[in-house]
Amino acid sequence: SCNTEVKEANYQIIPLPQEISVMDQAAPFILSNGTKIMYPEGNEKMQRNAEFLASYIKDLTGKSLAVQAGTDGKGIILQLGGNAKNPEGYQLKVTSDQVVISGPTEAGVFYGIQTLRKSIPVAQGVDIALPAVEINDYPRFSYRGAHLDVSRHFFPVDSVKRFIDMLALHNMNRFHWHLTDDQGWRIEIKGLPELTEVGSKR
């Protein structure tokens, strides 16, 4: 990048990871336009994770990062494995050459992505310095969710999608969608059209 301005990432996020070890003396990883996001070849869920991360980074920084199969080389690497014992746990390790997010499952890697996402500042047109760090994290509770009642009030589709995205950002893994109640029936069932033809207007 020709731009000399650099913004620094901040790992003090919500929820705070279980273990954060910042290497103050080590060189940071510089997130720039040339950074690549890599994932295990042939794994569609990990490819989707990589594409999610690329989308998040574009929203935050304006950078369009290349997504490619393979887990060798410099860049952001998503991989299965690591030492997390919880299936939704993950490890995030940053060196000057790589950002490696690993977990025993694709879900664990996804939550590692959320931690990276929250650490990156909203900064268009500048490079981002990610301090060298090792983060080990896992959820304390297997059920982490929130409830949204759409039976009593109308919600735009985009609002519901935004709500789900905020759940993911905060490492929630359950979306309790309250679709029906006395006030109305909100979910369309093709074989039972009267549920929405009549029930949605109550």
Regions flagged by a language model, labelled:
Residues 2-144:
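Acidic, contiguous N-terminal accessory segments
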Residues 47, 111, 156-158, 187:
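Short acidic, gly/pro-rich beta-turn/loop elements at beta-sheet edges
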Residues 56, 119, 163-166, 170, ...:
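Generic, well-ordered alpha-helical scaffold segments in large soluble proteins
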Residues 65-66, 129-130, 173-177, 202:
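Short, surface-exposed, polar/charged, turn-prone segments marking secondary-structure boundaries
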Residues 102-103, 144-157, 198:
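The substrate-binding groove and active-site-proximal loops of carbohydrate-active enzymes
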Residues 149-182, 189:
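A conserved hydrophobic secondary-structure block that centers on an alpha-helix together
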Residues 183-202:
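Aromatic- and acidic-residue-enriched carbohydrate-binding clefts of CAZyme catalytic domains
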